[in-house]
């Protein structure tokens, strides 16, 4: 019995897998591309598709407000579903409210800060810059709400709404775009991109993108469930967030590709230089 004191009791039990064990956090990983990282051309193509669509959606919102199917949905169906869930399944209602909070301004701002500091701690300044650029989602939301508000609002009203002066927030002044949908698209989209940059396995990156899409969709649907936004507002948040993410990703990947191309050209030039053969000094004297 004394000889068995140092033997672990659960020696045959496998350890839980570490989801971050296969991520590349070394400094040289910042200069490599691979996995599920999109190309700059694909990112810019998404931008070229989304931005004009967002423009026409803004024009539709300013001229019509909402469509007839949306009005029927938000008048006849959503309120009944919301009331039924509140009455028959209060835990589900609390869960949906909690999911909605994952796209709130304070949560997303804190998330950007935590992930940015984590990237710096791992020596990945490139990803920290990507996350810092993601905070542009906030002024982007404010600008879109300012220019699409009906009736128009003043800059002072917008400033007061940012701090909930007199309990009047941004959503009380302008519905378009849905701020939760926009912020969630940018935050979780860029977080998934960072995982794809760190993961050598393409499947890990695709899994991260899939989880991000599910989170964005769940957060956005809760805003409709809570009767805070019409579907057109949520669609506008998705488009605005996708446009910002695609621009940030394209700039990041294009800059990295240029650095890799320059390093390869420098290495090729150094290999093509004529090499001088070193001759020992005593051999020169004998000759």
Segments predicted by a language model, with ranges:
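N-terminal transmembrane-helix/juxtamembrane module of multi-pass inner/ER membrane proteins
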Residues: 2-110, 147-148, 152-168, 286
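Membrane-embedded catalytic cores of phosphoryl/pyrophosphoryl-handling enzymes
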Residues: 3, 158-285
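Transmembrane alpha-helix boundary/anchor motif
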Residues: 5-8, 53, 135, 139-143, ...
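Interfacial segments of alpha-helical transmembrane regions
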Residues: 43, 47, 112-140, 209
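Hydrophobic alpha-helical transmembrane segments
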Residues: 57-58, 100-123, 185-189, 196, 223-224
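Hydrophobic, membrane-inserted alpha-helices
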Residues: 93-94, 109-117, 192-193, 215-220
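Hydrophobic alpha-helical transmembrane segments of integral membrane proteins
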Residues: 123-158, 214-231
